């Protein structure tokens, strides 16, 4: 049976002064997409409450107030903001991919959240390496988030912005046979060169992985740019750089991309195109050479606290009997190693 789903890449501006308002705007966009028959909607990078554009155009010594405001408006996951989006996704029967500034106690993270069509969060991942100015704002993610998940729309993977220039991060998702890659960029940055580079990146990933790419970028109005910085020279750094698009496994646009203003790119994804591409070049299957080249990925969630403990000494009645192979190995739960008497 032929599989076809309708996807939307949504180019949208945050409400800089109202994080809750941005959440409501996202929910309205989900309803609007649902009216168009959309089954998968992808929103831009850290849309909620907004991408930290201030860190790109202001020196660190002057951005303390803006940094504090971002902390105040960043969202816990789960929390009221994600619950509102989950409800909208559930009502629309839609898979939603959303970028948020996640607050985890005293740290902020660039997080991507995938909501399944029933509203459940099936993936929350954090950008593994914040880029350039972003390192003053966000902490780092871990390898556990480089995961493809099953959803009502298919097998989904996600990366944010320049993570796409980390070929091993992309390959980690490719080896899990992602069918739809959900890409997010901030948009409204750097100018046309950023949009051009972005298009090359997403089209290349579609070709290399043999999957669809749904890419969403943000947008800033002139008034918002002026609010971020009154300096004309710096305002140029916050214009252009948008390429909201949907790409086929053959590397072609399935609908005209959106470069300016708010809007929605909608296209039908015919999954037979994945087979059409992969029958000739499956980079993690018949076209791979794992005995020559392969990937090692650490899937353990990052932790800053590891508990070491020692098991209680066994009684003689419960000691394991000796074997021809010698004494039994130490209990694997024991995390304290004591040197033998006389050892150095």
Q: How does the language model describe each region?
A:
Residues 11-29:
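N-terminal phosphate-binding loop and adjacent alpha-helix
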Residues 19, 28-117, 187-209:
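Cys-nucleophile CN-hydrolase/nitrilase-fold catalytic domain and related Cys-dependent amidase chemistry
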Residues 131-147, 164-168:
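Active-site glycine-rich loop that binds ribose-phosphate moieties when present
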Residues 217-344:
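C-terminal beta-strand edge segments of enzyme domains
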Residues 98-100, 111-114, 147, 244-246, ...:
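Short beta-strand scaffold segments in enzyme catalytic cores
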Residues 4-15, 42, 111, 124, ...:
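Active-site-proximal beta-strand elements of phosphoester/diester hydrolases
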Residues 76-97, 155, 161-265:
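CN hydrolase (nitrilase-like) catalytic-core segments centered on the catalytic cysteine
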